[in-house]
């Protein structure tokens, strides 16, 4: 057993030696191989480095050659440019030399002419002195006296010629102005087609049958009295078949009465309470119509941006007349005419139209305003923020204030043209209406008066007083005072009945 172990150990030793010998040999071969490869790599690197060095040297030589060539070219260009500049300098120097010679020659010529001119001036002065002395000797006048006479004569001739020229120009200007104004006014009138004429103070309401007349009158006339009292309108019921005539100088009252009566006829129930209700509705309808008419007028004339109160005043002009002419239609017509004339003259068309439309708004206010309607209209326009030009045109269209713009003159001319149109106005009707207005103005001037209506063509005035401010004795005294004031201030045919009405109502409700 020991022998076997020894043999194994020996075998292992032999095998280990063989392996060691083989490993050593392999390592030696590997080292030699690596050394050989390293030597080859080093030689290859040396060859590549040598090649790169040669290429770099060649590139550097080429770059140096290129830079030298560029420098030579730039040097040649600079040399050529310097040569061209030198040639130009030489040419300019030669040109300056020639100009200098020419200037010297011209200076010599000028000096010679100056000497000649000086000699001529001396000769002229000598001749002038000799002639003046000769003239003074012949005329026995000094030079100052002769100059004064000559200037006076020239002055007289110029003044005469100027006066003749001014007169001729003024005549031509007037002729041209008259001709141009006629053309402008004719053109404006032709382009403005107005179809409205004067209005009357009555309105006819159609009835379905004659039996309706009795219902309108009512028992013992209470219905017709109530309607007349509430509206201030005369109801004329005569033999005219199927018709009732409403008579009042105030178109607003007449319109309220017409609407209320037509509503009552359609409704069929006619008694004092129903009449009061229908009159209140009619008043609201008329107020709405006033607003719509004002807006329609601004739309027709192209005038925008008006204050709502101004529009309301415009609408009220529908129910105002001037010598029988509807004031709203008249204002629209004036707006058109003023705008057309402004366009012909190259003025502000919008300003002329606006002022023309608003020129009579002073007629739309109630009796609490005093003064000419033009001045009142100007104050209202200023109050509602209209421009100063519009305010002046309104206030000045009847000459109450001085006109400050040409558009104001056009508004005045358009107002006159519209009023002078055939069929537009009636003088007698206006005088009649003014008398009725004066009657109502006198009545309402007393404290405690609520409403007053001039009826029966001015032969009667009904005055409603406030019962809490005027008692029965006060009503009698007021009637006497009004009679006295009317007799002092008005001229009228016949007599006028003063009817002061004091009414007290007590209303309560059963529940």
Swiss-Prot record:
It is an enzyme of class 3 (hydrolase). Residues 201-286 form the KH domain. Residues 327-420 form the HD domain. Keywords: Cell membrane, Endonuclease, Hydrolase, Membrane, Nuclease, RNA-binding, Transmembrane, Transmembrane helix. CDD domains: HDc, KH-I_RNaseY. Its main location: membrane. The keyword Ribosomal protein does not apply. InterPro entries: HD/PDEase_dom, HD_domain, HDIG_dom, KH_dom, KH_dom_type_1, KH_dom_type_1_sf, Ribonuclease_Y, RNase_Y_N. PROSITE patterns: HD, KH_TYPE_1. It is found in: Cell membrane. GO terms for cellular component: plasma membrane. Its EC number is 3.1.-.-. Endoribonuclease that initiates mRNA decay. This is Ribonuclease Y.
């Amino acid at each position: 057993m020991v022998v076997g172990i020894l043999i194994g150990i020996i075998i292992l030793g032999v095998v280990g030696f063989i392996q060691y010998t083989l490993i050593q040999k392999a390592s030696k071969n590997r080292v030699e191989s690596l050394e050989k490869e390293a030597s080859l790599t080093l030689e290859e690197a040396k060859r590549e480095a040598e090649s790169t060095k040669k290429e770099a040297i060649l590139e550097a030589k080429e770059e140096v050659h290129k830079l030298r060539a560029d420098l030579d070219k730039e040097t040649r260009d600079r040399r050529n440019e310097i040569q061209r500049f030198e040639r130009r300098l030489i040419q300019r120097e030669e040109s300056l030399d020639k100009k200098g010679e020419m200037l010297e020659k011209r200076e010599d010529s000028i000096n010679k002419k100056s000497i000649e001119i000086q000699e001529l001036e001396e000769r002229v002065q000598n001749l002038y002195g000799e002639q003046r002395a000769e003239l003074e000797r012949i005329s026995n006048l000094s030079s100052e006296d002769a100059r004064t006479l000559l200037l006076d004569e020239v002055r007289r001739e110029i003044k005469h010629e100027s006066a003749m020229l001014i007169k001729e120009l003024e005549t031509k200007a007037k002729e041209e102005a008259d001709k141009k104004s006629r053309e402008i006014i004719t053109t404006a009138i032709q382009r403005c087609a107005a179809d409205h004429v004067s209005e009357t103070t009555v309105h006819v309401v159609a009835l379905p049958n004659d039996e309706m007349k009795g219902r309108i009158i009512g028992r013992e006339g209470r219905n017709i009295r109530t309607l007349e009292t509430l509206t201030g309108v005369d109801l004329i019921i005569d033999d005219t078949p199927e018709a009732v005539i409403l008579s009042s100088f105030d178109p607003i009252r007449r319109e309220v009465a017409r609407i209320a009566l037509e509503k009552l006829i359609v409704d069929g129930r006619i008694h004092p309470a129903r009449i009061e209700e229908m009159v209140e509705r009619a008043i609201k309808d008329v107020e709405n119509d006033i607003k719509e008419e004002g807006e329609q007028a601004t739309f027709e004339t192209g005038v925008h941006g008006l204050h709502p109160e101004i529009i309301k005043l415009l609408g009220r002009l529908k129910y105002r007349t001037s010598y029988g002419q509807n004031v709203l239609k008249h204002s629209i017509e004036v707006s058109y005419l003023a705008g057309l004339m402004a366009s012909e003259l190259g003025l502000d068309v919008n300003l002329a139209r606006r002022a023309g439309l608003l020129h009579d708004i002073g007629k739309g206010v109630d009796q609490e305003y005093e003064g000419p309607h033009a001045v009142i209209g100007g104050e209202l326009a200023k109050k509602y923020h209209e421009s100063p030009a519009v305010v002046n045109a309104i206030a000045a269209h009847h000459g109450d204030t001085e006109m400050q713009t040409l558009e104001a003159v056009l508004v005045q001319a358009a107002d006159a043209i519209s009023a002078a149109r055939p069929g537009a106005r009636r003088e007698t009707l206006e005088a009649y209406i003014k008398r009725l207005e004066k009657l109502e103005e006198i009545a309402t001037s007393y404290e405690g008066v609520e409403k007053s209506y001039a009826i029966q063509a001015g032969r009667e005035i009904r005055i409603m007083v406030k019962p809490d401010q005027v008692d029965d004795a006060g009503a009698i005294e007021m009637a006497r005072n009004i009679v006295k004031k009317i007799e002092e201030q008005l001229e009228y045919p016949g007599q006028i009945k003063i009817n002061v009405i004091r009414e007290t109502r007590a209303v309560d409700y059963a529940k």
